A protein has these predicted regions:
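Alpha-helical transmembrane segments of multipass membrane proteins
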Residues: 22-23, 51-53, 74-78, 104-112, ...
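Structural signature of hydrophobic alpha-helical transmembrane segments
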Residues: 4-17, 59-73
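Loop-to-helix entry region at the N-terminal start of transmembrane alpha-helices
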Residues: 6, 10-14, 65, 87-141
Length: 259
């Protein structure tokens, strides 16, 4: 197996790629120079911290620390997912439950089936991938659900006046929101290997792993991303649609935080 270690000097030279982005922003007057510098600086600091934390966790190889790190990943994913919602507030709890349950079930299946072992260097990276994908899916679900509720207030009110429960009145909206949230993951699965070489597969090949073995891991990743996204969006949607109704089963659009 061929190995290649990137040096600090080569990493510093690679920073020139960021300079290119800054120059383009300056020339085209995009006013993104500060944002680019801030995002790059923040990414460097975050990755350095995470790198040393993971190095410690991997060396200790403690189950409780591994679980704590998985929960930390799910916490951050839920926090960012609820921030992506443009139409209602206080969605963190539902986001955390949805992402944690979705990721937990997927990880349990992978571990029990023998696809991965319950060791930090396997569980934590996998948890990061599935939680990140679930975060995006849940955010899309929230936005679509909020848009649909606002645009279809009249139809919802009519269904409620005819005796429908909030769940019945929201059934089509929930279904369409879940579907819209899953489309990016499904489309990604359709084009994997044809349009792009995904992260895990590329990383393994770059590290010198046999491409056929790398493909097997990528197939596993495709399965787990679809599973987690499906579970997380369904849970998040069914926990969230109730925010649009009061205790009398009336639609309360004033609770939305439309921007």
């Amino acid at each position: 197996m061929n190995s290649h270690n990137i040096t600090n000097e080569s990493l510093a030279l690679a920073l020139m790629l960021v300079v290119v982005a800054i120059l383009i922003s300056h020339k085209e007057k995009l006013a993104l120079e500060k944002d680019i510098l801030w995002s790059v600086g923040r990414a460097i600091i975050q990755l350095i911290i995470v790198g040393y934390v993971l190095k410690y966790i991997f060396s200790v190889d403690d189950a409780s620390l591994t679980l704590l790190m998985v929960l930390f990943i799910c916490f951050n994913a839920a926090w960012n997912a609820q921030k992506r919602s443009k139409y209602f507030a206080k969605a963190f709890i539902s986001s955390f439950i949805a992402i944690t349950v979705g990721a937990g079930i997927t990880l349990a299946v992978l571990i029990l089936s023998g696809s991965i072992e319950f060791i930090p260097m396997q569980v934590i990276p996998i948890a990061g991938m599935i939680a990140g994908n679930a975060m995006v899916a849940v955010g899309l679900c929230y936005n679509n659900l909020g848009q649909r509720v606002i645009s279809e207030q009249q139809q919802i009110q009519e269904k409620l006046s005819l005796g429908a429960t909030p769940k019945q009145a929201s059934a089509i909206l929930i279904r369409d929101s879940i579907r819209a949230a899953l489309i990016p993951t499904v489309d990604s699965a359709k084009t994997v290997g044809l349009v792009s070489l995904p992260g895990m597969m590329s990383g393994l090949i770059f590290a010198g792993i046999d491409p056929v073995k790398a493909i097997k891991y990528q197939i596993m990743v495709t399965f787990m991303l679809l599973s987690t996204a499906s579970l997380s969006t369904i849970i998040a949607c069914y926990l969230t649609y109730r925010k649009f109704y009061n205790s009398r089963h009336q639609l309360v659009v004033t609770q939305l935080k439309k921007k």
